[in-house]
Amino acid sequence: MRAKNQPLLTNFDLIIFDFDGTIADSLRSYRELDQQLIKGLYRVWEEIDEIIEFRDKIKNKSRSDSDDEYYLALDRKYGDGKRPLSEIYAKVSEIFPLIRSKVKPKPGVVQVIKKLKEKYNCKIGMATSSERREINFFSSDDSLIGREINLNEYFDRIVTLDDVKMPKPDPEVYQQLISFYAVPPEKVLVFEDSLLGVTAARTAGTTVIAIEDAHNTRDLDQIRNLADFSITGWKELVF
């Protein structure tokens, strides 16, 4: 963490939010998905902490937002390693709607987004590794998040996984927003929670405030060192 004081929000013309782990308190819910997946495919009940540790180990090796390697590793650990990815993803698709309906916004984030929209003369964007259909779901009244804030209405522009060739940690998702608004990177502030996301935002030349998440503790020191500033929750943000 390089800055001792939080950057002034008035210094920026474009403010960009990540989604999972930054707006959505989703990371533990997605590990519950893995728990149900393992139970459904392999008849094994695994503790969530064990799943998180295993996922971190696999994701740390691949350093990619793709889940292919992780699901193949799950099949090697709990099965015979021969199950087709298509079958695994079919089970994920079956379980996912039940899990995502439980995802809540992170405490204080809805108030932050609404306050930025009302108080500051800047554009607000989202740069996410989620698919467009997921953002549409979380903008709807079918989700706990959508009942508090319609993301599609509050955000001026949303760039999703569908819009980029290279996911985070590649900076493309941020560069698209910067290019669209023709804003110098030094006038862009990003809120991120993950090492992949912070890396992408820093590579794009932006200022980064890290939102620490309990499920990214493995990378916490690196996140703090790479980000310009770090907070443990949205209620710490100074307006």
Q: What spans do the regions from the language model cover?
A:
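Conserved SAM-binding loop
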Residues: 23, 105, 124, 166, ...
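A structural preference for short, pocket-lining loop segments at secondary-structure junctions
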Residues: 122-124, 128
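N-terminal helical cap/lid subdomain that shapes the substrate entry/recognition surface
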Residues: 2-111, 120
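Conserved ATPase "switch" residues in P-loop NTPase domains
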Residues: 117
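Glycine-centered short loops/turns at secondary-structure junctions
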Residues: 120-121, 205
